[in-house]
């Protein structure tokens, strides 16, 4: 079973409009509300793929109750309740444009943060792999993910970590390392304080920087150009076919689902990388975020090429 962790989930509300009129009333006929957050996208994709998944994270108030109720019934859930209210994130879809209004979310009390660590520790007993995704809510220390990684390491459970900015920096500077990280070029540039290109020789050098020491897998998305990956001392380039992109949002989360599934099933390097890329591409072909059509899985799978470089 895979444990997904979403520390700052949201109710994602979609308002489709023909036109967004400013400073007047806009009436919406077809409103969509879903359980949102990067970790919950991972959860949905794992469930659709057919893997057993347990979802956890922080929820609060009536919106927190709504969120838990709107997660697929096939998914096991064990969220931790806090005093603050789960946030709303609103997307206004007008014409070809998308305007987002994102609430900051609740402020987590120090004791709640400590109590979740105990909750997380107990959940580790019943899972084989952990996937941690997204931002940290206000109130938690910047190195909170390092604490989760430490507990998972102590329990002998591999961790796939998908976060960015100060939270990722804190983990990289910690003695407790996740099994997998998946930064993109922009995030690599931010971490190293210099521009990082997609040149394979440069990426090889970058991923051997001391900052990344001790991390077993580093998987770098190159968008339409595929993926560059480092596993131990071996480097890989994944070539992907061109596809019709409908909605790329959530493709990174779908990739995390594939990585986690590959670890769960102890797949070869090539199998893990292909599965991760295929699930990311399948998500990009769908309108709904964090959703894959498994009917197209094998067709794409057979087109991917993994080369050791």
Swiss-Prot record:
Gene name of this polypeptide: lacC
**The name this protein goes by in its record:** Tagatose-6-phosphate kinase
Sorted keywords for this record are:
ATP-binding, Kinase, Lactose metabolism, Nucleotide-binding, Transferase
Protein family (similarity comment): Belongs to the carbohydrate kinase PfkB family. LacC subfamily.
Provide the species name.
Streptococcus pneumoniae (strain JJA)
Any one of the GO CC terms: cytosol
GO molecular function of the protein, one example? phosphofructokinase activity
Instruction: Give the EC class as a word.
Output: transferase
Output one GO BP term: lactose catabolic process via tagatose-6-phosphate
Enumerate the NCBIfam families for this protein: 1-PFK (TIGR03168), lacC (TIGR01231), PRK13508.1 (NF010033)
**Taxonomic lineage of the native organism:** Bacteria, Bacillati, Bacillota, Bacilli, Lactobacillales
């Amino acid at each position: 079973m895979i444990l997904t962790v979403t520390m700052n989930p949201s109710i994602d509300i979609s308002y489709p409009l023909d036109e967004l009129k400013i400073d007047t009333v806009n009436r919406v006929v077809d409103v969509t509300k879903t359980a949102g957050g990067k970790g919950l996208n991972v959860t949905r994709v794992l469930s659709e793929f057919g893997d057993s998944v347990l979802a956890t994270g922080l929820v609060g108030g009536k919106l927190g109750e709504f969120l838990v109720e709107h997660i697929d019934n096939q998914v096991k859930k064990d969220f931790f309740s806090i005093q603050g209210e789960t946030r709303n994130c609103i997307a206004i879809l007008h014409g070809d444009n998308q305007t987002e209004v994102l609430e900051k979310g609740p402020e987590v009390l120090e004791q709640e943060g400590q109590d979740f660590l105990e909750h997380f520790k107990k959940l580790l007993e019943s899972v084989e792999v952990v996937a941690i995704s997204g931002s940290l809510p206000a109130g938690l220390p910047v190195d909170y993910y390092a604490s989760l990684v430490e507990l998972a390491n102590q329990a002998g459970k591999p961790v796939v970590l998908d976060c960015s900015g100060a939270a990722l920096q804190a983990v990289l500077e910690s003695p407790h390392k996740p099994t997998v990280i998946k930064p993109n070029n922009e995030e690599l540039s931010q971490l190293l304080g210099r521009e990082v290109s997609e040149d394979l020789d440069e990426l090889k050098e970058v991923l051997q920087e001391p900052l990344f020491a001790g991390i077993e897998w580093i998987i770098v998305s190159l968008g339409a150009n595929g993926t560059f990956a480092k596993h131990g001392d071996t480097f890989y380039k994944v070539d992907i076919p061109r596809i019709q992109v409908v909605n790329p949002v959530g493709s990174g989360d779908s990739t995390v689902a594939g990585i986690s599934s590959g670890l769960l099933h102890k797949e070869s390097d090539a199998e893990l990388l292909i599965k991760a890329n295929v699930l990311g591409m399948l998500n990009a072909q769908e309108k709904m975020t964090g959703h894959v059509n498994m009917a197209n899985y094998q067709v794409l799978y057979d087109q991917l090429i993994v080369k050791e470089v």
